[in-house]
A protein has these predicted regions:
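Glycine-rich phosphate-binding loop of ATP-dependent small-molecule kinases
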Residues: 1-176
Length: 176
């Protein structure tokens, strides 16, 4: 990916859109959560497709809260949740996508990733543990992996980045 196509999060506001009303959003969210529960039951019953939900965000951005709120009406038998933390020794002994592929959803299931395979680029790049060539190769591998899931397993891959300000992050981390 060329630098001209990069998105700079610092250029994207963390403020709610003008005219936004929290009460309206809560009411809409409640209806959508119920609808998601119905759709999840249909997905599970048909066994023809899978969904992989990827949640990324800084510490304190609300990934855990989003999982609890959004998937509240879903049946636990049709969901898996994987929180990707620092790779274990066993995971380090394999390619960087090994642990992610193990957590990919089977048909009929929704797999929720709290953090994901993107961490294996983001964190290592920030700390200077991998060079730009390795970054490029891993991005290509991730794209190929997601295409494989889509093509071979009829998996819908949905990615969310929960974007908060540094002030909000600090506030959330202090509350822990």
């Amino acid at each position: 990916m060329s630098k001209q196509n990069w998105i700079r999060l610092s250029d994207i506001s963390t403020e709610a859109p003008e005219g936004w009303k929290e009460k309206d959003t809560e009411e809409k969210t409640e209806k959508l959560v119920k609808r998601l529960g119905d759709l999840q039951q249909m997905l599970y019953a048909s066994g023809k497709h899978a969904v992989m939900v990827v949640l990324q965000g800084m510490d304190g951005s609300g990934k855990d809260g989003a999982v609890h709120k959004v998937f509240d009406a879903c049946r636990i038998t049709g969901l898996t949740l994987t929180a990707f933390k620092k790779p274990t020794e066993e995971e380090f002994a394999h390619d960087f996508l090994w642990r992610v592929h193990k957590a990919a959803p089977q048909k009929g299931m929704i797999a929720i990733f709290n953090r994901s395979h993107y961490e294996d680029i983001l964190i290592q790049r920030v700390h200077g543990w991998i060079d730009e060539n390795r970054v490029e190769q891993r991005m290509k591998a991730i794209n190929a992996f997601e295409e494989l899931l889509t093509f071979d397993n009829s998996t819908l891959v949905i990615k969310f980045y929960l974007h908060i300000s540094k002030d909000e992050q600090e506030k959330q981390l202090r509350q822990r």
